[in-house]
């Protein structure tokens, strides 16, 4: 249980950092991974059960591979690193299983818990527009048109110089709004650095992952069972 609590603390801290600055400090996933392996060594010795240590190491390795694949897919380096940390920290945790995929993931030395946390987290992304809305409100964005009301849920308003640094795509300004910008919509030359424009949001995946981490011990793979029964 202590590993799970450490995971909660790490994810909450990562969520705050991601929400405020869209950056997650590396020390979080490193602490999760190091604590996970050290605690697994301690538990394996005191309980004379070395499968605990094997699970932690295999969880680290498998989640490292998955996290690297996430990075190559452009999903987010910070989110993938958190997965690596959780793989070492809580590779296994009690949760209900309803699907054949859940049964497969429940095999020995497969980190079924962090994988299921990330799967459920993807489904919880349906709530992300409300996270974006809340962040826009905190940043002082106030819609002046009907289009900007919609953008409060699906875009972010920021200064041009910040948008350029973060390589965002331009969605527009005032009534000149493009809800589906293409990759070439990054010509900031027509705006001043201090102007505020609407740009594409950076998806804070770690927030739905944190929510998933809290509820997955209760629901297991029930969402998969309801939406994609197999």
UniProtKB/Swiss-Prot annotation:
Keyword Secreted applies: no
Record has Transmembrane as a keyword: yes
Gene Ontology biological-process annotations: proteolysis
TM spans (from-to): 2-18, 24-46, 50-72, 79-89, 111-139, 205-216
Extracellular compartment segments: 19-23, 73-78, 140-204
Annotated NCBIfam families: FlaK_Arch (NF040695)
Protein name: Preflagellin peptidase
Gene encoding the protein: flaK
């Amino acid at each position: 249980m202590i590993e799970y609590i450490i995971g909660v603390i790490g994810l909450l801290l990562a969520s705050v950092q991601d929400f405020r600055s869209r950056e997650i400090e590396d020390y979080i996933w490193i602490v999760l991974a190091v604590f996970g392996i050290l605690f697994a060594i301690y538990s394996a010795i005191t309980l004379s059960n070395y499968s605990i240590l094997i699970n932690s190491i295999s969880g680290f390795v498998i989640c490292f591979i998955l996290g690297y694949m996430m990075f190559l897919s452009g999903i987010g380096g910070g989110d993938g690193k958190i997965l690596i940390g959780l793989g070492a920290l809580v590779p296994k945790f009690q949760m209900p299983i309803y699907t054949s995929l859940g049964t497969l993931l429940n095999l020995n030395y497969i980190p079924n818990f962090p994988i299921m946390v990330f799967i459920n987290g993807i489904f919880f992304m349906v709530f992300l527009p409300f996270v974006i809305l809340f962040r826009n409100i905190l940043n002082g964005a106030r819609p002046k048109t009907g289009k900007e009301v919609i953008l409060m849920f699906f875009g972010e308003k920021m200064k041009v110089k910040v948008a350029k640094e973060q390589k965002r795509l331009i969605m527009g300004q005032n009534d000149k709004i493009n809800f589906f910008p293409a990759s070439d919509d990054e010509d900031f030359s027509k705006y001043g650095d201090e102007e505020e424009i609407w740009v594409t949001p950076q998806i804070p995946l770690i927030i739905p992952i944190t929510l998933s981490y809290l509820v997955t011990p209760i629901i297991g793979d029930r969402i998969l069972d309801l939406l994609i029964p197999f």
